[in-house]
Design a protein with these regions (language model features):
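Soluble FAD-dependent oxygen oxidases
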Residues: 2-598
Length: 598
């Protein structure tokens, strides 16, 4: 199924030095600096050897073959495989962002296999004043899973998945009843987790849509998947987590034990409050069916396209604005409407019945609209949706498989995500669209804004990433997360973004096009400006947002930020954990190496 890969995405601001209104201090004013490998305070060989001897996993220097001179065609081919990329300590799923960051490996990496390995790495970094980086799936668009001159805590080997028929969080006996759940190591990926929970276990767990996204990072950012309109945010399903905090302590946190830290892990941002080593998530009863409606509609004029957008907005409000429908619709600059909607709990006949009134209008001889070849309505048993055998046989045109000899059979990914692999971002922005825009009196304003934005750049509405229209219990659970409360009243998340696939800074013949990047950034910014006229004070989803967002504290967390800031000071007063635009990052230089004086 096509996912967010098919759109061309965004950028609103272009000042690489924009650090936000909460950071007004001079960058040179500091009372603490971390050390780099060339500094006298950097640990010597014996210190690194001693660290390695503490580990059940491994410790190694990290070098990128992309920086070692001419890059072989064989390596570039391997980089087309997200599982290969994820298996390299030096690599990240995005390669950089123009004017912001480029992927650079850490100096050393701890390949963690246990929470004790993580604790040893955290303690070593704290005592030696070393910049610490955490990477599981490595999907951060903001570059938070890589940094030069750092120690990487690489959790990828921690990928164990265990199903529970009845799970009670530690210390919660007698306070909450046992529920079906799944415990997942911090290095597990979502496709593997779905395969275990749904294919083999016959249950559903709310996770992300991209197969190779890491479970831990998604939960800590809030997290949405194709069926979040029904089951809510991924973070809202968190029952318990094991986390190593800055003091090196391994904590088991839940609503009964360290509830403030537990809350912060549910959407407060990854790599900020500690290193998560294990998560336990509530599982849900599996719907009977999943399915999709896929089609593209071409309008023969601007006026016809505006009418088409108006019709779709009205149709969405009356027929699709409910828990059964998720995913997205794309509005293109060439008067093309791309529909990639997923549903749950319906058969094919019912899905076709729901869409029949809208399509009847589109297919009228005088409509000025044309449905392109390839229209499809499909429905299948939900238990098959992440079954590798089903995907690679019945949906082989929509998926790709890991071609490496001996690769696990469930190393599968959506083909439409291919263009995001090793992407060099020109920009990315998002904004939650409030439900009030669907009111009859506002629908024409919404349609006009979508049309105006599409004149500059393609944009998508991700209906599964707004919780308005969800069941009350899903909204109530999301209210107990740290994510910006704007999500609760939003019917969709609008995304505008773009970049170049398989581009690598400094690699001859494969470097990003800076001129194209600047042009794209301007167009993306202009498109978002059209939506800002309609939604002047929106929230933004932390994982899919503008690197240069100035008011990031409010945009990502709204009025939850003050509480997150207090929790950060409680568990990481010295700021060991730093990520770009993470909670508390306003106290540091842009590279996280120097603390700023308040």
């Amino acid at each position: 199924m096509k996912r967010r890969g098919f759109l061309r995405l965004l950028l609103g601001g272009a000042a690489a030095g924009a650090l936000g209104p909460w950071r007004g201090e001079a960058l040179g004013a500091t009372d603490f600096r971390r050390v780099r490998p060339a500094d006298a305070g950097w640990p010597g060989a014996n210190a690194w050897k001693a660290l390695g001897q503490q580990l059940r996993g491994g410790l190694a220097r990290v070098d990128s073959p992309l920086a070692a001179g001419p890059v072989s065609p064989e390596l570039l081919k391997q980089m087309e495989n997200p599982y290969f990329v994820g298996d390299q300590a030096w690599a990240t799923q995005s390669s950089g962002w123009g004017g912001a960051w480029s992927s650079k490996p850490s100096a050393w990496a701890v390949s963690a296999r246990t929470a004790e390995d993580v604790a040893a790495a955290v303690t070593f970094a704290r005592k030696n004043r070393i910049r610490l980086v955490v990477k599981g799936g490595g999907h951060s668009y903001q570059g938070t899973s890589n940094a030069p001159d750092s120690l990487l805590v690489w959790t990828r080997p921690m990928d164990r998945i265990v199903l529970h028929d009845a799970f009670t969080p530690q210390g919660c006996a007698g306070k909450v009843g046992p529920v079906p759940a799944v415990s997942v190591g911090a290095g597990a990926l979502w496709l593997h987790t779905y395969d275990a929970v749904t294919t083999r276990g016959g249950r559903y767990v709310q996770g992300g849509g991209c197969a190779t996204v890491g479970v831990a990072g998604l939960i800590q950012s809030g997290g949405f998947g194709s069926f979040s309109k029904r089951f809510g945010m991924a973070a809202a399903s968190l029952l318990e987590a094991d986390v190593v905090t800055a003091d090196g302590k391994i904590r088991t946190v839940n609503a009964c034990t360290d509830p403030d830290l537990f809350w912060a892990l549910k959407g407060g941002g990854g790599g900020t409050f500690g290193v998560v080593t294990r998560l336990t998530l509530r599982t849900h009863a599996l719907p009977e069916t999943f399915g999709a409606v896929l089609l593209n509609i071409q309008a023969d004029s601007d006026a016809g396209y505006r009418r088409l957008i108006e019709r779709f907005v009205a149709f969405y409000k009356t027929a699709l604005f409910n828990p059964q429908w998720g995913e997205q619709v794309r509005f293109g600059p060439r008067n093309r409407l791309g529909i990639q909607m997923l549903f749950e709990g319906l058969d094919k006949a019912k899905a076709e019945e729901i869409w029949r009134p809208f399509l009847a209008e589109v297919e009228k001889p005088d409509s000025g609209l044309r449905i392109e070849p390839g229209r499809a309505v499909v429905s299948f048993p939900a238990r098959a949706f992440w079954n590798p055998e089903f995907l690679t046989t019945k949906m082989k045109d929509h998926v790709r498989s890991d071609p490496r000899p001996g690769a696990p059979a469930n190393n599968v990914w959506w083909a439409s995500n291919q263009e995001e692999l090793c992407i060099w971002w020109h920009g990315y922005e998002s904004t939650w669209m409030p439900e009030s825009l669907l009111a009859d009196a506002r629908q024409k304003d919404l349609a006009a804004a979508l049309f105006a934005a599409s004149r500059h750049w393609s944009l998508s509405l991700h209906f599964n990433k707004g919780l308005a229209g969800s069941p009350p219990e899903a909204i109530a659970a999301a209210r107990e997360t740290a994510t910006n409360p704007a999500v609760l009243g939003a019917f969709a998340l609008a995304i505008i973004a773009g970049g170049e696939t398989a581009r690598y800074a400094g690699v001859a013949g494969h470097s990003p096009d800076e001129t194209e990047g600047r042009s794209d950034a301007q167009a993306i910014g202009a498109a978002m400006a059209e939506l800002r006229k309609l939604v002047p004070d929106p929230g933004s989803y932390v994982s899919e947002s503008n690197y240069f967002e100035k008011d990031w504290q409010r945009a990502f967390w709204g009025n939850n930020y003050a509480r997150l800031r207090r929790i950060k000071k409680k568990y990481d007063r010295d700021g060991l954990f730093f990520v770009h635009h993470g909670v508390g990052s306003e106290d540091w230089s842009a590279d996280g190496m120097a603390r700023l004086r308040s």
